[in-house]
């Protein structure tokens, strides 16, 4: 079983890397040379695959029932059309090719994503529990409402609360994401390189990365020091979209 999980993750890794490489290659040749990054940008940090893998691994312990990683991804994608956390990035140009910036993870978006992830997890858990009870010859009603009532009676809490309390975390913590993405300071651009100077209590932290500007899209590589547990997520670029202001 563990070998099957490993092979599945490897397949997803290769597909993700191939798609990301093709996207970046295309944009590299067709991107504009606009160095003015001024404006409010936002990106959706997709954690659907990580949440699905974590839930999938935990659900393997339910005896005599089967669930695939694809099944878990379907559950996760049925909520909010996938699980994403909004990251906001603002640039204000103060001189030619330089200015100030601010980046932060939306706490409200994180809370909504976390809730949706566990609701999807609970839906899968209840379906598998109903299947297990049916196989064991449980004669009473095994629809979702009845199983939810059974879980509440057994554990003294709802399925979502039970999974939040006793199952593994489906998302990186908000603190970890804030440590990775939040910050402000000054920036400068040169050719295809964006350099940001993050101001912190320890001093100034320098971060240099290639960027691609294509109309209202700004593509940045995901941080190689990603807080995500699944290795393939580090290959996905972050695609920020410029928020249009009404004139």
Predicted regions and their residues:
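Lipid interaction determinants
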Residues: 10-247
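Positively charged n-region of N-terminal signal peptides that target proteins for export
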Residues: 1-7
């Amino acid at each position: 079983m563990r070998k099957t999980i490993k092979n599945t993750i490897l397949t997803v890794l290769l597909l993700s890397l191939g798609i990301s490489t093709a996207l970046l290659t295309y944009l590299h040749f067709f991107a504009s040379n606009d160095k003015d990054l001024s404006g409010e940008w936002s990106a959706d940090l997709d954690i659907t695959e990580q949440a699905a893998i974590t839930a999938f691994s935990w659900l393997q312990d339910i005896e005599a029932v089967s669930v695939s990683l694809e099944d878990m991804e379907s559950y996760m994608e049925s909520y909010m059309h996938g699980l994403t956390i909004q990251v906001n990035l603002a640039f204000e140009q103060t001189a030619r090719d330089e200015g100030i910036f601010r980046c932060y993870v939306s706490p409200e978006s994180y809370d909504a994503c976390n809730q949706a992830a566990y609701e999807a997890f609970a839906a899968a858990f209840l379906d598998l529990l109903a299947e297990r009870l049916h196989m064991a010859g449980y004669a009473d009603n095994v629809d979702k409402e009845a199983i939810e009532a059974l879980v509440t009676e057994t554990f003294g809490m709802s399925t979502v609360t039970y999974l939040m309390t006793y199952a593994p975390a489906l998302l990186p913590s908000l603190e970890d994401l804030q440590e990775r993405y939040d910050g402000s300071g000054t920036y400068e651009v040169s050719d295809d390189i964006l350099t940001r100077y993050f101001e912190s209590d320890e001093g100034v932290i320098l971060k240099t990365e290639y960027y691609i500007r294509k109309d209202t899209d700004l593509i940045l590589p995901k941080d190689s020091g990603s807080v995500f547990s699944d290795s393939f997520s580090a290959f996905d670029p972050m695609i920020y979209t410029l928020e249009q202001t009404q004139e």
